[in-house]
Amino acid sequence: MATLLYEIGTEEMPAQYMPGILKNYKELAETKLKEARIPFEKVSVYGTPRRMAFVAEGIADRQEDMTAESKGPSLKIAFDADGNPTKAVQGFARGQGVEVSALEKRDGYVYAIKHTKGGETKVLLPALLDDILHSLSFPKTMRWADYDFGFVRPFHWMVALLDSEVIPVEANDVKSGNVTRGHRFLGSQTITIPSAEAYVKTLEENFIIVDVEKRRALIREQIEALGKKAGGHTAISEDLLDEVTYL
């Protein structure tokens, strides 16, 4: 089992957009992985004003195999009185890419059964991540330079890793890698992510808390500590706390 990371680094996104963006990002990641028949255990989403990221744990090495069944003409139409295949069943078999002899007879009809072996996950991921990127929706989008593809804000970097292997994704002349941007004032300006599993810890070591709930809790603790120090009571506005969490 592997861990998948996909981070999109942008210019500052509006705080009021962030909860919806991260919810949409998580749902898209889960939906696209399921549609691609790539088993996974859990998807977690992370965000700061300049980044959105998801980490999918327990990613299987290969797609699940698929069996598809197509119902064809009735046996009365498929074969003549002597049991020879008619043009109807020959056309059906040809359209399904199978021989007439491979058709299954059941319940008075013929069926084409096709088995498709699952592909290798890392081969499928570039297209899947590109699909997620282009499927994200926002209250408003921006276009920049001469690019046709718009986004909530211009994006300047992407990190896409399956464990420690870079998954190639490219959009608007930005190519994925294993390097993210650091805090504007603290720590390194560029940070190498050694593996998808180490994403959260690596950023925290560089003064970036990408876990939204952890960041909100820390802000609350600091507000309450200041209030207690001043000998007062802190009346915290939850809406304001939510906004500050994304600033």
Placement of each model-derived feature along the sequence:
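Long, basic N-terminal domains or extensions that often function
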Residues: M1-L247
